[in-house]
A protein has these predicted regions:
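N-terminal twin-arginine translocation
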Residues: 32-41, 50-72
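Metal-dependent enolase-superfamily TIM-barrel catalytic cores that perform enediolate-based chemistry
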Residues: 185-331
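Structured beta-strand/loop patches that form or line metal/cofactor-binding pockets in enzymes
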Residues: 68-108, 112, 426-432, 494
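Ligand-binding pocket scaffold of soluble enzyme catalytic domains
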Residues: 108, 169, 203, 391-392
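N-terminal secretory signal peptides
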Residues: 1-35
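Shared catalytic-loop signature of beta/alpha-barrel
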Residues: 125, 130-134, 308, 314-317, ...
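Extended hydrophobic packing segments that form well-structured cores
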Residues: 456-494
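Metal- or metallocofactor-binding catalytic centers and their adjacent structured scaffolds
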Residues: 102-175, 488-489, 493
């Protein structure tokens, strides 16, 4: 192989010498136009041509072509040696994972908020010894262990960490490995602040938009907010705990799908919910997109009635009106309303987004990268939706690790609208990390895309993370040898 390259190099070196001589003769020729002469001079000064590179020694050729690769890392020889974790109190309980290698570099990922870190730990035995730069290969090995919502947390967390590692190994940002970027900043959407009085809420909204700089907001419009109004709901007391979507228990309201609760909204209830939106819209104005979410577990007909009552407020979208699996119901709602519909935060893999996209059952898809499959799979989801004329917003509720993974994916996906930030009012959230290129994590409602920082472009500030470990598990990236042994045959076909 070496002798072949050297023969090619010798031949190209001779051609380069002839090309250089001919170029100089044309530059010196008085008949050559100034524009042509300037162009020829620039080609001579603009860097090494392919033939020039081939004219180098074999060793110099390798050095030139791998000049961006970190010298302390040999990507082709990287091997995964460990997977460790810590659990933070971000959004109650969110785990960060770290994948270590034989060359001292590591990658950071995140198991989705509320998910068990064991979703990631059980994958360790499947990836030990693998080269982390073979991201797609490893993803295909482990994706069978993912599922909807938090069940995908382990697979997606590992995938995030692999892109962080790969970017560090090749000294390029993760977005570059996804094919390049469409934008230098990523627009963020945030929740509308809640308050006890309209005057206080107006003050908080102005702070959110004018001081913090957020130009896209989202509010909750829940039947839980009208449950105490007499005559607002039919069948409101069937569930003893009320109508909170956060209840536990398998027979609770929260675990009863929308068509099966028997709860209906009366005209009085619709007026009350519309008034809630009217109040916020009047404070926000119409220059800022306003999205809505968390309506409650109501059936298809009540979703349409509520949507029509809110159409006049020109909302950016109605989110998750029914469970994502109910494609036909989503399509019926979408066709009945003027307001855009959206779902997707609990969907794993492109194949499960396709029914919604192919049937144009929603106007906007809304993957959560920590559930949808990680950076590359989420970009594929966005690209597929783009072909069908559907936009993509991104759900995100986690630490700065998943936040930055989303930023890289959003930068690399053309039909992107806005990225959710669920910890705007958590004062210590940004302090968990430092950016490796000195940029701000968030600047006036936008996330600057790391233009040169390798991988995800952030590192943990250990002493700060340790202040916010979950009391149920205060370990911090300790070895996990108990997860080294693989104990099953994983092939899914015979």
């Amino acid at each position: 192989m070496k002798s072949i390259i050297q023969q090619i190099a010798k031949s190209n070196k001779e051609r380069e010498a002839i090309a250089t001589q001919n170029r100089q003769q044309e530059i010196d020729n008085p008949a050559t136009s100034n524009n042509r002469r300037n162009f020829l001079k620039k080609t001579a000064l603009g860097g090494m041509s392919l033939t020039a590179i081939m004219g180098l020694s074999f060793e110099d050729t390798i050095a030139q072509t791998t000049s961006k690769v970190k010298r302390e890392s040999k990507p082709s020889e990287l091997k995964i040696t460990d997977l460790r974790y810590c659990v933070t109190t971000v959004l109650g309980r969110t785990a960060i994972i770290r994948i270590d290698t034989n060359q001292g570099i590591y990658g950071l990922g995140e198991v989705r908020d509320g998910a068990d870190p064991r979703y990631a730990l059980m994958l360790k035995s499947r990836i030990l010894g693998e080269n982390p730069c073979n991201v797609e290969k490893i993803f295909k090995i482990i994706k069978q262990f993912g599922g909807p919502a938090r069940q995908a947390g382990g697979v997606c967390g590992v995938e995030m960490a692999l892109w962080d590692l790969c970017g560090k190994a090749y000294d390029v940002p993760a977005w570059q490995l996804l094919g390049g970027r469409y934008r230098d900043t990523v627009r963020i959407y945030a929740d509308t602040p809640e308050a006890k009085t309209p005057e206080e809420q107006l003050k908080l909204i102005k702070y959110r938009t004018e001081t913090q700089g957020y130009s896209w907001l989202k509010m909750d419009v829940s039947i839980n907010e009208i449950k105490d109004i007499p005559g607002a709901l039919v069948n409101p007391n069937i569930f003893k705990e009320g109508s909170s979507q956060w209840q536990g228990g398998y027979m609770s309201y929260a675990n009863t799908r929308h068509p099966f609760t028997g709860i209906q909204i009366t005209e009085k209830g619709l007026e009350a919910m519309a008034k809630i939106v009217d109040n916020v819209r009047s404070m926000v104005g119409y220059e800022i997109p306003l999205s809505t979410d968390h309506y409650g577990h109501i059936d298809l007909n009540n979703c349409i009635r509520l949507g029509k009552a809110l159409d006049k407020y020109r909302l950016a979208w109605l989110e998750d009106m029914v469970p994502w699996q109910m494609t036909e119901q989503h399509k019926t709602i979408t066709e009945a309303l003027e307001t855009p519909t959206l779902t997707g935060e609990d969907i794993f893999l492109l194949e499960n987004f396709k029914p919604l996209i192919d049937n144009h059952a929603v106007d906007i898809i809304h993957p959560d990268l920590a559930s949808s499959g990680g950076l590359l799979e989420t970009k594929r989801i966005g690209d597929y939706a783009e072909e069908k004329g559907i936009a993509m917003a991104m759900h995100q509720a986690g630490t700065p690790i998943s936040f930055m993974a989303n930023v890289h994916c959003a930068a690399a996906t053309q039909n992107f609208l806005a990225l959710e930030h669920h910890s705007v009012d958590l004062p210590w959230w940004e302090g968990l990390v430092k950016t490796t290129d000195g940029r701000k994590l968030i600047d006036k409602g936008y996330a600057p895309v790391p233009l040169s920082a390798p991988g995800l472009g952030i590192e943990l500030i250990d002493e700060e993370v340790k202040k916010h470990l979950h009391p149920g598990d205060t370990t911090y990236f300790v070895p996990t040898k108990e997860w080294d042994e693989k104990r099953s045959h994983d092939r899914t076909y015979s």
